[in-house]
Design a protein with these regions (language model features):
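A glycine- and small-aliphatic-rich helix-loop capping segment at beta-alpha/alpha-beta transitions
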Residues: 13-18, 78-89, 111, 135-140, ...
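Short glycine-rich, Thr/Ser-proximal phosphate-binding strand/loop in the N-terminal lobe
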Residues: 1-39
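Glycine-rich phosphate-binding loop plus the immediately following alpha-helix
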Residues: 102-110, 121, 128, 136, ...
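Short beta-strand-loop/turn "lid" adjacent to the catalytic site in phosphate-handling enzymes
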Residues: 52-100, 118, 126-137
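Short, well-ordered amphipathic alpha-helical segments that serve as non-catalytic structural scaffolds
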Residues: 43-55, 156
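Short glycine-aspartate micro-motif
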Residues: 1, 62-66, 173-177
């Protein structure tokens, strides 16, 4: 479950086989009806359930719900179990930003509570691997945050490494995510050590952000 600033991307897997993938785009006038990302939750839930219904998938037959996340406290990269504390921190924007990515955690939690199964988040936007020298700005006391498209960045980097016959952890890469938001990130031996701060409008202008 991958909610973005302009779309909801949903995939259904059986083991490692991708059975269905769909990107449902949301018009700007529709999104402007919702003052905050939290307010979009019922709309995004309907989109998700409509996707499952369209493909004749019973939510009760799903073993694992995985949601994109973000907006909670900083955490390490990888897979994390979704629990009530994470959902609360996510809903309250403990990480200091408000972005629809966080709805992946909330949707996975809601569906799991109704239909059963397990629930995880993978590489949410609040993963922080920045090196110390990437944090200072030109203003005393103001530091850069780690807010980037971690899920796609690390996913594409891993695919690229596999094509090269190498491990992601052995490579140095520059990865650019281009969508409603754009982030450009330096990957060093499996860590995202420097990046533009997408949620704060850092970097190039995008379809939904002014840029710097």
């Amino acid at each position: 479950i991958n909610p973005g600033s302009t779309s909801t991307k949903v995939s259904y897997f059986e083991n490692e086989k991708n059975i269905f993938t769909e990107s449902i785009f949301h018009d700007a006038p529709e999104l402007l009806k919702y003052p905050t990302a939290n307010d979009q939750l019922p709309m995004r839930r309907k989109v998700l359930l409509d996707f499952l219904g369209k493909h004749n998938i019973d939510p009760g037959d799903i073993d694992v719900f995985i949601g994109r996340g973000g907006c909670a406290y900083s955490q390490r990269a990888g897979v994390m179990v979704i629990d009530e504390r994470l959902v609360e921190d996510t809903a309250r924007d403990r990480g200091g930003s408000d972005h629809p990515a966080k709805l992946g955690v909330m949707l996975a939690y809601d569906l799991c509570k109704v239909y059963g199964g397990k629930m995880y988040t993978v590489n949410p936007t609040n993963v922080d691997e920045l090196c110390d020298y990437a944090r200072p700005t030109g203003i005393a006391g103001l530091y850069r945050r780690a807010q980037t498209h971690v899920l796609n960045q690390k996913g594409i980097a891993a695919i690229h490494a596999k094509k090269l016959g190498k491990k992601y952890e052995d490579l140095n890469l520059i990865v650019c995510h281009v969508d409603g938001g754009i982030t450009i990130t330096a990957h060093c031996k499996g860590k995202m050590i420097d990046s533009t701060e997408g949620a704060g409008g850092d970097g190039p202008f995008t379809p939904t952000r002014l840029g710097s």
